[in-house]
């Protein structure tokens, strides 16, 4: 039995969307295109045909409403999967902005994914990525709590980290990026693929999350009856 409890409607709506897709999409290829690629008109067509009829009202309302303040005007959230799902989150937007800054300065961060070993990754980091953190504008952004929030760091935690580092947040972020890009092989490091390539390894399908692997698809689908989800606090569950 697997019980997911979360007060955050956004988190649970994505979980429920994945569960419905896992159960009702015709095969692994369709599932991978929906959540691995996460873009293209075909995702919306498959949502309407296979997934939407099986969503609860709360989840359906979430995906078919807008992220804009009124929720009634603006593009629907499900449209994220047409435009590029992984670009829509605050983290995705921050990564996209970082790549834009890189292009403006003539840097292609995706090249680190082609490094064959740790020494090549380290050399690329020192030549291309490390200088990025010496940019005055980038250092200013790194000191801003909004940047931390985009990375999933709550403001209170950001303040603690800032105090612990004695205001050296740019150096802290620089070391985290170095660790991500240098200390782990790129073959199965899907976090690095998203950060430096803004995608998963679609060609080899090695640097992808376990739930997207074809060899796990049948087992996951078979265990769906054991899963239940609740939008509630743990104290009230």
Model-found features: residue ranges?
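Class I S-adenosyl-L-methionine-dependent methyltransferase module
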Residues: 10-217
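Conserved SAM-binding motif I beta-strand of class I
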Residues: 2-6
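Adenosine-cofactor binding site in Rossmann-like domains, unifying the SAM/SAH pocket
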Residues: 208-236
């Amino acid at each position: 039995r697997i019980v997911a409890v979360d007060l955050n409607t956004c988190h649970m709506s994505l979980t429920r969307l994945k569960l419905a897709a896992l159960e009702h999409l015709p095969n692994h290829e369709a599932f991978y295109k929906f959540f691995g690629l996460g873009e293209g008109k075909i995702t919306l067509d498959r949502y309407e045909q296979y997934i939407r009829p099986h969503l609860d009202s709360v989840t359906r309302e979430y995906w078919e409403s807008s992220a804009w303040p009124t929720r009634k005007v603006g593009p629907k959230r499900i449209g994220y999967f047409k435009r590029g799902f992984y670009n829509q989150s605050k983290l995705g937007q921050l990564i996209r902005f970082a790549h834009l800054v890189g292009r403006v300065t003539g840097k292609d961060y995706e090249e680190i994914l082609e490094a064959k070993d740790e020494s090549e990754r380290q050399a690329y980091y020192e030549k291309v990525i490390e200088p990025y953190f010496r940019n005055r504008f980038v250092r200013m952004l790194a000191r801003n709590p909004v940047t931390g929030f985009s990375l999933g760091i709550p403001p209170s935690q950001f303040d603690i980290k800032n105090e612990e580092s004695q205001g050296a947040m740019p150096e802290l972020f620089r070391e985290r990026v170095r660790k991500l890009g240098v200390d782990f092989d790129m073959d199965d490091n899907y976090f690095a693929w998203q950060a430096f390539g803004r995608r998963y390894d679609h060609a080899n399908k090695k640097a992808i999350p376990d739930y997207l692997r074809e060899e796990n698809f049948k087992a996951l689908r078979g265990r769906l009856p054991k899963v239940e989800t609740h939008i509630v606090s743990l104290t009230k569950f």
